[in-house]
């Protein structure tokens, strides 16, 4: 099987595919030349991220294409329904970005509570002359340990965020229309620790959370 990873692919992923006997091409093909390349090179599978689109015209122009894979969660750049109607399988990697998004949320939580953005802008410019004033202003940060984090929607990203928050000693509440409870599994030095969380109402989350 011949696969074009048009938006790149991690070396481990490429090696795994090649170990299964696939030929993986990683060259970037411009969107307007993509259909011709797929046909001329007898490409069986197309892997994309967000830069490349796979619309109806591409699908129609590539009748031998067997699948389109999206390295990420959203498939807005793929006409997935039409592709499946044409017998082209479409899949994504729903858990691939959960930890990344959760880490970004936690980094913003720490940064906002410790005035990191403001200090990073002010200290290099005025730190020498007004250090004592800035130190006093930016020394009023808050610890997140012991605070309550409210999460609206408790899918993969919400659960991953809960793992980080619980690991920091936070209390976690969540609201989700389709869940009544959820067990979050933390890995502590390689040992699993299960934490059972019960759903709260939307109003309870708003009322009791320090951060949402």
Give the predicted meaning of each segment.
Residues 86, 94-148:
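Phosphate-binding beta-alpha-beta segment of Rossmann-like dinucleotide-binding domains, i.e.
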Residues 25-30, 49-50, 126-137, 191-199:
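Short gly/ser/thr-rich secondary-structure transition/capping motifs
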Residues 53, 74-77, 96-97, 135, ...:
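Residue-level detector of alpha-helix initiation sites
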Residues 135-211:
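Rossmann-like dinucleotide/phosphate-binding beta-alpha-beta segment
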């Amino acid at each position: 099987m011949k696969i074009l990873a048009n938006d790149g692919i991690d070396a481990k992923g490429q090696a795994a595919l090649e170990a299964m006997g696939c030929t993986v091409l990683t060259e970037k093909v411009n969107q307007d030349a993509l259909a011709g390349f797929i046909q001329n090179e007898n490409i069986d599978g197309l892997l994309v991220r967000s830069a490349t689109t796979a619309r109806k015209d591409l699908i129609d122009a590539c009748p031998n294409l067997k699948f389109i894979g999206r390295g990420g969660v959203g498939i807005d750049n793929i006409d997935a329904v039409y592709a499946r109607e044409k017998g082209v399988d479409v899949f994504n990697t729903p858990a691939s970005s959960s930890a990344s998004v959760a880490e970004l949320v936690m980094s913003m939580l720490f940064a906002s509570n410790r005035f990191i953005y403001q200090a990073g802008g002010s200290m290099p410019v005025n730190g020498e002359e007004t250090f004592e004033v800035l130190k006093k202003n930016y020394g009023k940060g808050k610890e997140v340990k012991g605070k309550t984090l409210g999460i609206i929607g408790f899918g993969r990203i919400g659960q991953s965020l809960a793992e980080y928050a619980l690991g920091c000693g936070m209390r976690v509440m969540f609201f989700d229309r389709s869940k009544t409870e959820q067990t979050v599994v933390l890995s502590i030095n390689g040992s699993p620790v299960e934490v059972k969380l019960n759903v709260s109402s939307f109003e309870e989350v708003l009322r009791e959370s320090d951060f949402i």
